[in-house]
């Protein structure tokens, strides 16, 4: 990780959605229509964050989006509130510099304001870098494999983390 990379993590603004969409389309195979981003921003604006270079304002290099949902706990049979990671992406030139980690830390703090009990996410089974980040840095646990989850037929790992196990903040 390049500790000299000076970034700011802050809420995404509506006029920055095109930059977020560009990062999404250039880095991830899952693409969403603009109204999807608008809905997340409208309902969970505090959990829709961007990262920008400190010395170059409005130069967005990554983003993270969460939503809150109710469902059965990944760790027991009870109805709970979950923070669900919708999307996380960092521009190619800024990967492996700690940007995703910083986005996750700051956004997970925000998601906690919704009194969630756990965090959940899906990640491509071939995305070893992301899996390493989620499991080894953030302590997410693999709950199951969602077969053929993605449009191209790839499996997703369904990972979860109990809120009380947030020992990385």
Where are these regions (language model features)?
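Conserved Rossmann-like nucleotide-binding pocket used by diverse enzymes
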Residues: 8, 84-86, 119
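Intrinsically disordered, low-complexity regulatory tails flanking kinase catalytic domains
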Residues: 1-3, 74-78, 136
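Conserved glycine-rich acetyl-CoA-binding loop
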Residues: 87-105, 114, 118, 124-132, ...
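Eukaryotic N-terminal low-complexity, Ser/Thr- and Lys/Arg-rich leader segments
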Residues: 1-13, 164-169
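Short acidic/glycine-enriched loop/turn segments that link adjacent beta-strands
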Residues: 44-45, 127, 150-155
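Conserved catalytic-core motifs of GNAT/GCN5-like acyltransferases
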Residues: 71, 120-122, 135-158
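Acetyl-CoA-dependent GNAT
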Residues: 14-93, 104-114, 162-168
């Amino acid at each position: 990780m390049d500790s000299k990379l000076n970034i700011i993590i802050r809420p995404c603004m509506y006029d920055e959605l095109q930059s977020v969409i560009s990062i999404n389309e250039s880095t991830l195979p899952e693409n969403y229509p603009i109204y999807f981003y608008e809905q997340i921003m409208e309902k969970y604006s505090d959990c829709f964050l961007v990262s920008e270079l400190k010395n170059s304002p409005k130069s967005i290099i990554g983003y993270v989006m969460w939503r809150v949902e109710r469902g059965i706990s990944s760790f027991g049979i009870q109805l709970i509130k979950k923070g669900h990671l919708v999307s996380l992406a960092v521009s190619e030139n800024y990967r492996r510099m700690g940007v995703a980690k910083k986005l996750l830390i700051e956004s997970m703090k925000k998601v906690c304001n919704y009194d969630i009990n756990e965090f959940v996410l899906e990640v491509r089974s071939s995305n070893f870098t992301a899996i390493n980040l989620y499991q080894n840095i953030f302590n997410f646990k693999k709950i199951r494999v969602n077969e053929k989850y993605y449009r191209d037929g790839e499996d997703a790992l369904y990972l979860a983390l109990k809120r009380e196990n947030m020992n990385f903040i």
